């Protein structure tokens, strides 16, 4: 729904009353499916076209591989929703219903691994980079979830997908996660991610020089050229230029 004075649509909370005895992980997992022949043909034709007709590097979004992305939890494309759809309820379920979340992710991963194989066959080396996750793990000052929760619920499935991609292709893998995720980065590297975006340098602990010193040999940092919360929208042109120049010196 778009507010009368707004410029974008708000996702309405359509959480149905939760009956713990009838709660079925497959209601959330139903959001994911194996790619169709038409989907694969589109990916194959598009990547080949850009590969043969341009000198651009090509990255492809692999659908259905972001575990717990709260932009997708409400399932705004569905007429009716089942399962856990309220974002606050979802985050609480990471602690209150971990078995439920695990089963959702387990089914999602099963489907995602099939899609990795299909996409690898469809586009091969026409792509150089793939986007698999836009799940934000950080707030301004800390992580959304504890490291133990990440390691038990998210990491096993992310690693399974990344390992399969690296096994079948030469693609590099990037994850998008805003926020203060410094403490999570070693686990992201261990899970097989090659590139981190957007590098929110305004968040706690996300100093560009320190990130490069600590993790630069294992991870590509894509972004972080300027503080997009303060300097870019509110700074003077000279302040923007200076910050970008300072950031370039880190590279």
Functional labels for PLM-detected ranges:
Residues 9-251:
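Active-site loop segments of alpha/beta catalytic cores
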Residues 4-7:
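Low-complexity, serine/threonine/proline-enriched polar segments
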